[in-house]
Amino acid sequence: MERAVARGEFACLVFNSVSIKLKGRGIRSVIAAGVVASALSAGAVCAPAMAQDKASADHIKAVTSAVDTGFIRANAATSKDWPTIGLDYAETRYSKLDQINTDNVKQLGLKWTYDLESVRGVEATPLVVDGIMYVTASWSVVHAIDVRTGKRLWTYDPGVPRDGGYKGCCDVVNRGVALYKGKVFVGAFDGRLVAIDAVTGKKVWEEDTIVDHSHSYTITGAPRVVNGKVLIGNGGAEFGVRGYLTAYDADTGNQLWRWFVVPGDPSKSFEDESMEKAAKTWDPAGKYWINGGGGTPWDTMAYDPDLNLIYIGTGNGAPWNRNKRSPAGGDNLYLASIVALNADTGKYVWHYQETPGDNWDYTSTQPMILADLTIDGAPRKVILHAPKNGFFFVIDRTNGKFISAKNYVDVNWAKGYDANGRPIEVPEARGEKPYDAIPGPYGAHNWHPMSFNPKTGLVYLPAQHVPLNLSEDKSWRNNSNIPGQAMSGLGWNLATAINVVDPTSQPFGRLIAWDPVKQQQVWKQDYVSPWNGGTLTTAGNLVFQGSADGRFIAYNATTGEKLWESPTGTGIVAGPATYMVDGVQYVSVAVGWGGVFGLLERATDKEGPGTVFTFAVGGNASPPEFTKYQMQGLVEGVKYNPADVGPGTLLYVSNCVFCHGVPGVNKGGAIKNLGYIPASELANLKDIAFNGPFKAHGMPDFTGKLKEEDLLKITAFIQGTADAIRPKPAAK
C-alpha cells in the first residue's frame, strides 16, 4: 500500500477576504465564519498568487524539470543547489558557497525543523533545487519540503512491509533520492525502484529490481541518474545474495543494462567476459553460487563525464569466511573492489581490488571521491577512497592503476601494500584461532560520507572502531539455522563466529583531516562514540559534521578548531547539505539515530523522531523538545530454569542479538535492549514474538520460526544475564 500527500491537491479560495488552504494532512488555517465547506470542492484557484508562489506546482515543475546531467555538471561550478546525493558527479561534497564562513559561523542559528515522523535510522542527505527539498526517512518514505517555510509539500510512502525489517542487516534506512527531469527516484527497502512526480508526489512508475526473491535483497542506497539512466545497486550479502548494478530508463523504467559483480554457477554460461575472468579466482568446490557470493554494490557510485565511466564500490563476500565460499583461496573477483563500467553499456572496463579474498566484511562500498591531484609533479585523475579495511587509497581513475595506500587508523590484518597494490597480509588474520579484528566488520570507515576540499587539499573522513572478535564457524553450512550461528534464524550466512572470545581493542569515533597526496593525517577530532555523521566542506573554510551524541558541529577546515555547535537531541549519522535560496546560504542535516551500530547502542540520553534541522546566519527558531531516553533498571523477578540459560544464549544469538544487542550490556539504540524491558513483558515474550503485534515497528513475526519452549529459553538467557551483571549490594 502506498500513500502520497500532495500540496498540489488543494483548493485556494478567497471568501470575505479570508484565504483558506486545505492540505492533504488537514486544514491548517482557521476557517473563518461565513465560509462554507462545500466551497472547498469548487476548484477555484488563486492563479495570480500562485504564479508568485515559489512553492507552486508550476514553479516546482519548472525547476525540477530542468535538472539533468548538464544541470548537475553546471551546478558544480557554483554549488548554488544540491541536485545529487554527493552534490556533484565527483561526489566531493565540497560547496563553493562561502556566505557562511569562519568569520560568521558563530552567528549560525536554527531557521526551522521538520518532523520526518520516523523512529528508526535516518541516513539521507537532502537534495535541494531552488528551495525545494527532497529527503528520505526510514522505510524509504520520501518527503518534499519548502525550504523557504520549512513546511511539507508532500510525502510518498512506497509501502514497504513493516514486518520485513529483518531482511536487512543494518536497519530500515535510506540514504536519499535522485532527481532528474521532474522525477524523484527512490530505491525502496524491499528492492523496488520507484519514480515519483516531483510536483505531486504521485508514483509515475516502479520496477522490481530483485532477481531472486528466495533471498533477502534490499536497497538502502541512493540512486544516481546519468544521461537518462537511473543506476541502482542492492544489499544483502549477509543473507547470501549475488550483487549487481542495474540501469533503468528514467522516462519509462525499462531495464537498459545490468552488470553482475561476481560470477554465477560455472556450469552455466557466463553473462560476459568479465564474469568468465572472475570465475577463475573462485574455487567451485565452495559452491559459492548457492548463496550468491555477495559483492553487493549497496552505496557508493561516482561518474566521470569526460571518460564516460561509472565507478562503483563492491561489497563483501557471501559468506564472510573465504574458507567456506572458496576453500582453495583466490581473490574472489570482484569483491571489495572499485570497478569502472562504461556508462552507456554497463560493460566492464577495469577494476582495482582493495581487499583480495575478503574474509572480514571489508566492503569497498564506502563513499568515493573523484579528484584531480598533482602527484610526484604530474597531474593525475584519481579516485580517493577510504574503505572499511582501514587504508586510504589513491587510484588512477583512467585505468584503475594503484598509486598509493596508507592506513588512516591502526590495523592488524595487513602491514601495508606493496608496489603492485597487493596487501602484505598478517597470517594470523586468516588463522584458525579467534582474531581480534582491527578494524572489525563495522569498518574503520563505513557508509558515512567523506568530503574533499580542493582549497585545503584535505579529505574529511569519519573514522571509527567497533571491537569485534572473529573466528571460523566450523559448523556452518549453506542456509543452515543452527542455534549459536549469528542471526541464522533470520537468514544470515556468515560462516564466521563473533565474539566467542571477548575483543580487547577499544572503540572510538574520530574525524580525520587527511592529506591524500602525502598520505598522512593533518588534524583530528575525537568523539565519545563511533558512528558519527558524514561531512560537508565549503569554500568558507568550514567542515560540518554531526555527532553520535547529538551535536551539529562546524570546524575550521584548515586547523580543525571547533567554531560552532548546536544540539540536535538524538545522534546524527547522515551527511549534511548546503545550498543558496533567494541569496541566503542554508545548511541542512537530517537527524535520526540508527543504522547497524545505532540499532543497539547510543551516545546520548535524548531521543526524538527523525528531524531535518536547517540553519542560516541569524536564524533564531526554537528547537523541538528532546525527550529523555527511557531506560528502566535491569529486569528482575522473572522466573526461569537455570538449565535453559545456555540453550537460550544460542537461540538469542541466532535470532535477536544484532537488533537488540546483549541484554543489559548494550544501552539500546533505535531498538530497545531486552535487558531493560518490564518484567511483565519478559514473562510474556510469546505475546511479543508471535502473531506480529509489533510488525508496524519492524519486529518480525516468529510464528513458525520459534516454539514456545524456545522463548522460555530466551527468557532464561535475558533474565539470567541481567541477574549476572546486576551490581551486588555493598557489604555492610
Q: What spans do the regions from the language model cover?
A:
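Blade/loop signatures of beta-propeller domains
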Residues: 53-110, 268-276, 422-423, 500-501, ...
